[in-house]
């Protein structure tokens, strides 16, 4: 599906297309993000708008458009790939705009979880304990090397573990990938490391 989540009409059409193809929508994963780890003077308003439009507004738009379909699902889940709301100033000072945009997604978790609770729709957050080796590493300006990361597999498996939970009994949580996998009895995470001989880089927003 071709989708620009900044365009609410495009989003609505994509949801309708997905629902028609699959016979409904059981799960919405809000993963699309724009990132720029830049200070105030180095963040053009165009870049600020992009991060807000994709991260916060896009999450709201996709959830709003998916809601009619999620209401009909047997075990509906909305999952945000967003961090816990860590209000320590150090997570704002070097990239206030990005933190605002990303925390907007996390604020949606809090609001949607309470709003949709009577509907039985779960809304939770998932955030990796370590930096994940994806194309987004380029935005870290060389501060993080891929060998100090884990692979996306750990996030995918954690998401699967979460999305099979009873939606009526698990909502409004901010989970880490390690936490969800430990619940499944997985305690050895070396297999997820890009290079298990190298130290891992803890992800943003985690102390």
Question: PLM features: what roles do these ranges have?
Answer:
Residues 63-64, 110:
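A short, exposed helix-loop element centered on a Lys and neighboring polar residues
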Residues 71-72, 76-118, 130-131:
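Catalytic loop of short-chain dehydrogenase/reductase
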């Amino acid at each position: 599906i071709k989708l620009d989540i900044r365009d609410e009409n495009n989003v609505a059409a994509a949801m309708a297309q997905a629902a028609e193809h699959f016979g409904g929508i059981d799960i919405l994963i809000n993963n699309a993000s724009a990132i720029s780890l830049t200070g105030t003077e180095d963040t053009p308003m165009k870049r600020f708008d992009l991060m807000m439009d994709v991260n916060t507004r896009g999450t709201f738009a996709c959830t709003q458009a998916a809601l009619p379909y999620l209401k009909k699902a047997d075990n509906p889940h909305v999952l945000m790939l967003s961090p816990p709301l860590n209000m320590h100033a150090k997570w704002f000072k070097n990239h206030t705009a990005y933190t605002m945009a990303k925390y907007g997604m996390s604020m949606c978790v809090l609001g949607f979880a309470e709003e949709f609770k009577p509907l039985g729709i779960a809304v939770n957050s998932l955030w990796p304990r370590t930096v994940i080796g994806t194309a987004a590493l380029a935005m870290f300006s060389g501060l993080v090397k891929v060998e100090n990361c884990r692979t996306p597999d750990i996030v995918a498996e954690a998401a699967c573990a979460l999305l099979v939970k009873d939606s009526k009994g698990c909502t409004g949580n901010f989970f880490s990938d390690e936490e969800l996998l430990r619940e499944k009895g997985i305690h050895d995470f070396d297999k997820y490391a890009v290079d298990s001989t190298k130290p891992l880089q803890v992800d943003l927003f985690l102390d």
